[in-house]
């Protein structure tokens, strides 16, 4: 069980590291996370050490949607559902790899 948990965390770290590898050009640099509101810190060797995990404020929609309809978020991995009035949507907040 401990080995399985270690592997999960190691794979998650590698995936996050790969997603941000171009963003960390300077040690100690802080970069914007893919969600657009959290921040990640770069280690001395230019690898992401960790990111904040705060709740992000809802984003405003630039267009309306069909009430009750579901659609893919622009990140390609989260799913959104349109509100009953078609003026807002709620999306899942999974970390995308």
UniProtKB/Swiss-Prot annotation:
Name of this protein: U-reduvitoxin-Pr10a
Keywords: Disulfide bond, Protease inhibitor, Repeat, Secreted, Serine protease inhibitor, Signal
N-terminal signal peptide: 1-18
Chain intervals for the UniProt region annotation (Pro-Pro-Arg motif necessary for proteolytic processing): 57-59
Species of the source: Platymeris rhadamanthus
Chief site of localization: secreted
Role, per record: Inhibits trypsin activity and prophenoloxidase (PPO) activation, an enzyme essential for both clotting and insect innate immune responses. It does not inhibit activity of chymotrypsin and protease K, and has no effect on phenoloxidase (PO) activity.
Subcellular compartments: Secreted
Family membership: Belongs to the protease inhibitor I19 family.
Pacifastin domain mapped to chain residues: 22-59, 62-97
Record has tRNA processing as a keyword: no
Pfam annotation, one family: Pacifastin_I
Marked site positions, Reactive bond: 53-54
Domain of life: Eukaryota
GO molecular function: serine-type endopeptidase inhibitor activity
